[in-house]
Amino acid sequence: DQKFSNKFYETMIKNKRVDIHTRLFRLDFLKITGFAVLLLGAIVLSYIYLLPPLAEKSVEILPETVDDEIGNLFLDQYIKEQDVDKIRTLKLQEFANGLKLNNSKPLNFTVINSNEVNAFALPNGHIVVHSAILKGMKTPDELVALLGHEAAHVNHRHSIKMLSRNLAGYFLVSLLFSDVNGAIAILAENAQQIHALSYSRKFEEEADSEGLKILVANKFDPNGIVRLFEQLESNESKYIPQILSSHPLTAKRKQS
């Protein structure tokens, strides 16, 4: 009858409206979820690929006294725990003083007795050399190549730049609010990470290039840097030298 037909029609219209609302809700939910996923992805990608280079670039606004402060904080604690070879330290310092290392600040050298094949530069201009890497050298050219390489890390502030990259989020937030002292404090709190930093390929190639120029400028055999690489590789056949964890040796570096 007419009454039943009208009621049936009203029910159909109502259900259709409910169905439309449900579809719209689902569509909005999918849009919101998709946007949230895209936003999260953008944040993650920015943190990985955008913030570290920005943090590295921001180091330029920090005075080099920051490098000295961070280096001193690490060195004061580190040296207490090491067996310093005072005689070799004096000889190495004397040898280095006679070289043109293009250094932007005074360079100080310390030799420590260690079976680990390693050498590393601190941002304050202090270069630590392990006795094991010295024992493996056959010519002065290799030593000049090593010192030139490490001096380049100091000159280009590589360790401070890498530390800033590793702490990019905290570091940039401080600088964003013009809190330079806060940024410096963050670096200082993490000064002990300096020893464990792994330089980027770009920094290593930059240091290799400058090390080669230093060899030539001081009238040493440029092949000294090749022999240095060969020594590191020969040690790698016995065990992975500590220096390779912070100075990755690549085929491209050897070829260049």
Show which residues each predicted segment covers.
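A Zn2+-metalloprotease active-site environment signal
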Residues: K3-S256
